[in-house]
Amino acid sequence: MDNGMPRARPGIDAYPLEFSGGGGEFFRVWIVNVLLTVVTFGFYTPFARRRTAQYFWGHTMVADSPLEFTAQQKKMVVGFLLLVVLYLAFKVAAETGQDTTVSLMMLAGAGFAPYFWGSAMRFRLNATRWRGVRLQFTATWPEVYFASWPLFIAALAWAGAAVAIDARVSPSMTPAQAKAAAGPVLIAVGFALLVTVVCLMRLEFNYKSLLVGKARIGGQPGRWKPVFGDFVKIWLATVGVFVGSVVLVAVLLVAVTGGLGSLLPRKAGLAAILIGIALFIAFVFLLFLVSGPARAYREARLHRLVWNNIGVSHVARFKCDLRVGGYVMLRVKNILLTLLTLGFYRPFALVSEYRMKVDSVTLHVKGGLDQLAGQLAREEQGLGDAIADAAGLDLVG
């Protein structure tokens, strides 16, 4: 009976995500993986990937319950061996001058790239469980290939550039003809590069939106809100950060070389060689650093954008408060320490960056967590395994 009182709206509970792993603990997993991969000439790679995924999944706490990585090792090994065979076949064809075979294999690789991506996402999500409920990727192959159209546009751009270059360049060209052809060749390459960058932006947006929109947990679909313009803004801002980093490095190089340049004429023999080697190492070191802040900036901005604009149907959503500046500084510190320790700081770097991203996300659930978990478990039982196995062959782990 309605007594005129408003109905109580279901409450929304917040559950911060948490990563409970540690750098020292993961270092033991990492060093064993590295040693066994070296000893087995790389064939331990699928086992190493599974151990790494199990560690990070198992220490990622969502509402006080860890994720589970349940991928079958056999599938990961078969996929890895198949990729090794394909790579060796391509390398043999390239080194023996089989240009037609190489071209056909490259075209086949471009054609199968969406299939590999779709198989990888299906494999990864199907291997992830939370409270016994499995995630699923339900996109059809036509949907995957339609989302991959930027990949084919980029391939056509480079094919057109190759045709244009072939028409302008020949082995019998005179120096004057080569000079005249340089302009059109640069224009063709520049146009292909520009098209590729735009296509990469669109491809990233298409794949992320398809992954979230076609993901299922217990039958509940994912919810995706970002638009392509959001990705364009992040890419443009990333270019600005990269240019700023280049300018800063250039100023440092001028200052260092200007100070040491006066020493070179007065030094002879071994001392001059050592100074030259030191400058070269510093140059390579700075080149490696120059892209680090830009890549970290883009990664952090995308992390915030995605996790602030996705959810699970209308029953759960996420919020992210990742500090972009803090993440960039963490990446720079990790790069420096990894270089100074000859790579041995790498596992600590991975853990610290993963923890910062995970700990920045909060899950908001409508109606209570136990009610949601029970609903997801019941709906999953009705779906069965048909959707999960629709790919037929999961190649990439």
Model-derived regions, located:
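Interfacial aromatic "cap" segments that immediately flank transmembrane helices
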Residues: 16-36, 68-85, 133-159, 213-247, ...
